[in-house]
From Swiss-Prot:
InterPro entries: Ribosomal_bL9, Ribosomal_bL9/RNase_H1_N, Ribosomal_bL9_bac/chp, Ribosomal_bL9_C, Ribosomal_bL9_C_sf, Ribosomal_bL9_N, Ribosomal_bL9_N_sf. This is Large ribosomal subunit protein bL9. One of its GO terms (biological process) is translation. The keyword Ribonucleoprotein applies.
């Protein structure tokens, strides 16, 4: 399936690239989320007319993500959770908990933007958590988990 990308997509291409993807990826992700359009002659012409507008929108999104990244870089979030004597949590701290704590501290973060490559946090301590704000912008936040 040939598509024209309407924004930068990680591991696929940039705005305006004509790419070949599997039909399921195109139909179920790229097209419904407005990240691409079918590569027909009419859509190519319409895209070229809107290219400047789309590039400006992409630049605005990146600029707002960089602003949020600068705010997040200064943050250190403390999350209180019940834990046993040896520092092992009863339960865990996941992306939803971290996103809620960051939002409460003044920076709007969605849980899908929080990246925990090693899985949920299950111990008391300090952790560096990556927050993926844009395809090109990522911030690191210090999360401190303390026992209640």
């Amino acid at each position: 399936m040939q598509l024209i990308l309407l924004e930068k997509v990680a591991n696929l291409g940039n705005l305006g690239d004509k790419v070949n993807v599997k039909a399921g990826y195109g139909r179920n992700y790229l097209l419904p989320y407005g990240k691409a359009t079918a590569a027909t002659a009419a859509n190519l012409a319409a895209f070229e007319e809107r290219r400047a507008e789309l590039e400006k929108a992409a630049a605005d999104k990146k600029a707002s993500a960089e602003t949020r990244a600068a705010q997040l870089a200064e943050l250190e979030v403390t999350i209180t959770a019940t834990a046993g004597d040896e520092g092992k949590l009863f339960g865990s701290i996941g992306t939803h908990d971290i996103a809620d704590a960051l939002t409460a501290s003044g920076v709007e973060v969605q849980k899908s933007e929080v990246r925990l490559p090693n899985g949920t946090i299950r111990n008391v301590g300090e952790f560096d958590v990556a927050v993926h704000l844009h395809a090109e912008v990522e911030a690191t936040v210090r999360v401190v988990v303390v026992a209640a």
